Amino acid sequence: MSVKLLERILRAGEGRTLKRLRNIAHTVNAIEDEYKGCTDGELRTFAFDLKVRHQNGESLDSILPEAFAMVREASSRTLGLRHFDVQIMGGAALHMGYIAEMFTGEGKTLVATLPAFLNSLSGNGVHIVTVNDYLAGYHSQQMGRVYKVLGLETGVILADQDPSTRAQQYRADITYGTNNEFGFDYLRDNMAWSCAERVQRGHNFVILDEVDSILIDEARTPLIISGSSSGEVSRWFVEFAGIARALTAGEDYDVDERKHTVGVLEPGIAKVEDLLGISNLYESVNTPLISFLNNSIKAKELFKRDRDYVVLDGEVMIVDEHTGRILSGRRYNEGLHQAIEAKEGVEIKAENQTLATVTLQNYFRLYKKISGMTGTAVTEASEFMSTYKLPVVSIPTNKPNIRKDHPDVVYKNEQIKFENLADHVRECYTRGQPVLIGTTSVEKSEYVSKLLSKRGVRHEVLNAKNHAKEARIVAEAGRLRAVTVATNMAGRGTDIILGGNPEVLTAVELRRKGLDPSKDPERYEQAWSSAFPKLHRRTREEAEKVIEAGGLMVIGTERHESRRIDNQLRGRSGRQGDPGESRFYLSLTDDLMRKFNPGAASALAARVPDDTAIESKLVSRAIRSAQAQVESLNAETRKNVLKYDDVLNRQRAAIYTDRSRILEGGDIADRVQAFLSDAIEEIINSHAVTAWDFDALWADLKTIYPVGISIEELTDEAGGMGRITPDFVMREILSDAKFAYEKRESEIGPESMRDLERKVVLSVIDRCWRDHLYEMEYLKEGIGLRAMAQRDPLVEYQKEGFDMFEAMMGRIREESIGYLFNIDAQVSSNSPSDARNRPIEHDDNAV
């Protein structure tokens, strides 16, 4: 089925869905007055009654109107914000498992309180995923005030919390956090050595804020927990960084920016061999050098400082391409990060081995119910449905959108583009109109900043180097004469309100005074009641002046690879029916045109003077064509990632379920004895041929347990060598093994035996799984070559992956038994490696 046909089918029922959502809003409106005269205590009692009714069998759907009316009243009392009807509709859509498309400024944060409260009544917890730690903390504090009136506890998961704090936060009715924190906790829980070490309590209902950013943009990025691997940092990284500098693009190697790959040419190979003093780079003994060479060229050509990463305090730190934020603790894998460190001349840190991994796609599929919100989902509706079984519904705006979206202005080269952009910003600044400028990298944001400073335009810069000021900068971005230069503003997740954001400004002011709603809620509420009205009044007065100046002007400096990201940037302006404008300033040398439509760009460049702006349908078509190519390519990649990861996901589910049973079950003696029987059976079957080689059989058996019966005793028991059958051998050896097991148990005591069994099996599972992850990654890297032999790589990956998994399970059985009989019985109460020590978290960008 084509994507366009699927989109038409998905949109066909939207009218019926909206009608149903409107009816729900009308029902809530009809009963909301019942709660206006209640005291806070009475409201809490009503909320508790709803919980009891649900536990007694009443469905959440039937109590939805009452629950939503209570939340609306609680919000009005604490925040001074009453949910609009469209917000009630959005909340109902989330409860029903939809992705609610709600434009920027429609109050998505407040919308989430409705389904969060309703679904928390089950007692199984609700997770709300935000785009960063700051918003997780801020939303949990502000929305937590609403939940508190209703008798609920609110938690938040932050990067610097210890395990006991995290466990406490997960026990709350509603827990806020980022996708990374939730995902890494899931992985760490499945590396725990006792139930007490685990922090999560299941996956019931999750609400994803900026759902497209999480499930689409970051879908290809797996969460990886790594530990240090053996071996020292190789001098080859430094050596090859120098070699890469000596090579020339186009002459010694090719670069494909679209596919993010490099290929070394014959002249380049000859140069490398000469520089290394070797005769053949591709001899088997030199195979490891090829990886060093490829990574050093990638680091040189495909990974740019202040775009893909920054160097802070002598450390290479990855910049999130979607949000512009630093991904603290993340590293590229397979030697690429070390190659970049060598290129930059900073300390080269050791490579790490994967201990646990999961993609965001498969992590969020663990939840019984999933929903999400975003300003731009309809363009990806077919992918949401096919991948996650999530329908999309577009919620109407509370007020009509009156923003003016001006045609793109295109220049021949980048320098002229930025000069004209800066002149335009100065005009807006002079008349008091606030401006938001979206750039694609730290480097570009700093270049624009220099041009504005030359023109005397006061401004703020928001990029990966100063993200700590983010809340204040965004809160003031809609004020009179405010100019804000931001990298990838699309993912910032905070409203830009004309005149300033009174809620955020109030929170910043109270925090500056040392007030914390979680530590002293009563004092905080009193201070809020005093500070908020003043700031609200001041910002509204200033908003009137901003409206007269034309509202917020949004300027894009490049078209993104996805139309959705462009729309998100535009959507920062014109919230809640406010006036506003948007315009993109482009050049024919921008990355999008250069990579994906170079022919059209070259043809136009040849006909246009340097200082002339282009506004033509041809340019628009070329841009749309380039974006369509990239969107199609990225969607296919995500689809492919999921197909391959589904193989590993089934294996991961089996291992983690098995591991969890061991943690929770306590006594695994029967399981261990089954391991012993299976291992013995496999060994005997491998030797059961026409002529028995008992010496070889006994040698193999002794690797798993101390054999107590001799070959002579076995022969005598059978009544002669000719009467020995496989069944007889099996019976005698199993009897002997059972005796050895009982002897081992009597030597160390039953309690120590149970403890030893549990720790040995967990240790072997973890080590074998770690090795299996490495082998599966190695298999996936080379599986594409099977297509040359007319074989489907995915089918081959599934088949060989299954065989490797079965082999791993066999190793787990044999090694567990071997260790059980041979390891020192004095078992430490601590695990060999504490899974709760902060891991190294990787960004696998599939390069």
Swiss-Prot record:
The keyword Cell cycle does not apply. It is a peripheral membrane protein. Residues 835-847 have a biased composition (Basic and acidic residues). GO terms for molecular function: ATP binding; protein-exporting ATPase activity. GO terms for biological process: intracellular protein transmembrane transport; protein import; protein targeting; protein transport by the Sec complex. ATP binds at Q87, G105, E106, G107, K108, T109, D495. The keyword DNA repair does not apply. It catalyses: ATP + H2O + cellular proteinSide 1 = ADP + phosphate + cellular proteinSide 2. It is found in: Cell membrane; Cytoplasm. Its main location: membrane. It comes from the Bacteria. Residues 828-847 are annotated as: Disordered. InterPro entries: Helicase_ATP-bd, P-loop_NTPase, SecA, SecA_CS, SecA_DEAD, SecA_motor_DEAD, SecA_preprotein_X-link_dom, SecA_SF2_C. It is an enzyme of class 7 (translocase). Keywords: ATP-binding, Cell membrane, Cytoplasm, Membrane, Nucleotide-binding, Protein transport, Translocase, Translocation, Transport. Its EC number is 7.4.2.8. Pfam families: P-loop_SecA, SecA_DEAD, SecA_PP_bind, SecA_SW. Part of the Sec protein translocase complex. Interacts with the SecYEG preprotein conducting channel. Has a central role in coupling the hydrolysis of ATP to the transfer of proteins into and across the cell membrane, serving as an ATP-driven molecular motor driving the stepwise translocation of polypeptide chains across the membrane. Monomer and homodimer. Part of the essential Sec protein translocation apparatus which comprises SecA, SecYEG and auxiliary proteins SecDF. Other proteins may also be involved. Belongs to the SecA family. This is Protein translocase subunit SecA. It comes from Tropheryma whipplei (strain Twist). The gene is secA.
